[in-house]
Regions:
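SAM-dependent transferase fold signal centered on methyltransferase-like domains
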Residues: 1-200
């Protein structure tokens, strides 16, 4: 009886299609894992029982402050210090290597189970989708109204939030589609937050 030497997680167009295992007759102390999504590739070696912890988590206060500061500097004509949002591709999601991903790309986790990451700098080669955060709000009705002023439609997604994407879209009175992206999630302090983004 052999053991697994390699794991290949293959996604096409953001959908996980195959999980391929390479086994041989040797005993292995570590397993080579390769996550592929179209042209994106992320590889690492997994040692049994080894798991990279998540980096510092973002609480709602930090997130709102960073988002507000970026927006204020843009309105004042000063060079903006934008906030970027990163969503791993389907293969990374299947592999569950979020701590390693964040460490390798210098990102902070938005929340413990959100699987979304933020940074003040744009990261080249990130395996997944990248967005610039144009605004952030709690679920406070007035804050949401100000955040979504003039936006009639958006692509809505939720991560670690008690509402489905359809429920959130209805609550926000948005049509599906357009070039705006709305992410609903839970920050590290347990606050439900809404991020308004543009895809890069």
């Amino acid at each position: 009886c052999g053991s697994v030497a390699e794991v290949h997680i293959v996604s096409v167009g953001g959908e996980c299609k195959e999980l391929l295992l390479v086994a041989d007759s040797d005993t292995h102390d570590s397993v080579s894992v390769t996550c592929v999504n179209d042209t994106e590739r992320f590889s690492f070696t997994h040692t049994d029982g080894e798991q990279q912890p998540l980096p510092p988590l973002q609480d709602a206060g930090e997130l709102l402050a960073a988002s507000t500061a970026a927006a204020a500097s843009q309105h004042a004509g000063a060079p903006a210090a934008p906030l970027y949002l990163y969503e791993p591709n389907a293969s990374i999601m299947k592999a569950g290597c979020f701590g390693l991903l964040a460490l390798r790309y210098g990102l902070n986790a938005l929340g413990r189970n959100s699987n979304l990451f933020v940074s003040n700098s744009l990261v080249d080669g990130f395996p997944g989708r990248q967005f610039v955060v144009t605004g952030c709000s709690t679920m406070n009705r007035q804050s949401l109204k100000a955040l979504l002023a003039g936006i009639k439609s958006a692509n809505v997604a939720v991560r670690n939030m008690p509402l489905s994407a359809d429920e959130l879209r209805k609550k926000l009175a948005l049509k599906d589609g357009g070039d705006s992206y709305v992410f609903g999630t839970t920050a590290a302090d347990g606050t439900h937050v809404i991020l308004l983004c543009k895809r890069i």
